[in-house]
């Protein structure tokens, strides 16, 4: 018997080794291309702002309160939280797959065995034996069978298939959490962008109202000049048309304010309400991001990069699990409980019955399917790596572009300030010249149009600077968790 056992084990070992020789090799996880030491040639060493919380980044109390409200009530954040629960449930299921499964059962049956069946002959012969007690005699018409107990089964994870599937689920759970962090950062920046857009629109209304007052006064002056013969009806109509155009623009801006307020209310999950806000766009109210950090910190702080990394690790674990599927599966099973054909003796300790089973199975005619699964998992690992590298490249270039935009927009702001100041003086001069007949009404109209255009351009440049600073905060990983 010992020789037979040795032969069996030897044959089993040879079978496993032969299977192992045919198992494909997995590809190691690739490393992303190294990032440069700095974003620009002029950038120096600095401290990252990625860990700067939005409450410290934005100094506007109304904006901070609005962001808090959005994060607490936005429907997308609640959806993301539910998705995290789903990913956590998948992870728990994978963890449970490594443990034995145990079930409790109760079974009762009755069987009539024919006289020419093995069971029928055996039961008849047993009842004739003098070695059994009366309680052990088997009913022959209907043979009952009662069973109450526990059954257990366990797949032993020798090759790491279940462990790698668990690891894949864990990495995807972490990727889902990063997705929620990415959503949080997006909500913060979107809320702040709309908020500053709203302030800009408020200021635009103020600028238009100021210009309407100026145009009213100019119109009255032209009417007076017409009465004394120094201006024509055409001049009056031109000033009147310009005033009507400015008023129409004002109504359009007010509609934009309503639309922007409604967008913010939508973010908060509200139907109605008001948006409390400051009266001016103050760039100093946003912490300037001169300390934009080292590019390598993107890998640590950007939630989209972290999510892509976890997806890469999950795909590698899937490939390892697909490879492990080529190896034999080892299963253990056991039962323990009470079993008897005599109901009166069912709870007697002598009715305790146990069973222990062990089995091993190896794939033979399934290898095309297994190989296909492995090839798919390997290709998905490559795709995950390329997505990871792509995400890093996109993040780096995004920061470079925003830093360049900030630098150029500062120069734009400086020139726009000069333009507005010059055009403001130009309006005063044109009015004085018109009164003294050294300028025509057309020059006044042109000066007023240029001034209002310059005022709005300066306002939009300030808004753009605020928006790009907000986007840079997000691009560096700020606001994410």
Show the residue positions of the predicted features.
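Hydrophobic, lipid-facing positions within transmembrane beta-strands of outer-membrane proteins
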Residues: 146-152, 294, 354-360
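Amphipathic alpha-helical coiled-coil segments
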Residues: 80-94, 183, 187-209, 217-224, ...
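Short, solvent-exposed, mixed-charge loop/turn linkers that connect secondary-structure elements
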Residues: 34, 210-213, 230-232, 251-299, ...
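Extracytoplasmic loops and strand-loop junctions of Gram-negative outer membrane beta-barrel proteins
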Residues: 49-52, 129-136, 341-343
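Bacterial Sec-pathway N-terminal export signals of envelope proteins
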Residues: 22-95, 202, 283-313, 363, ...
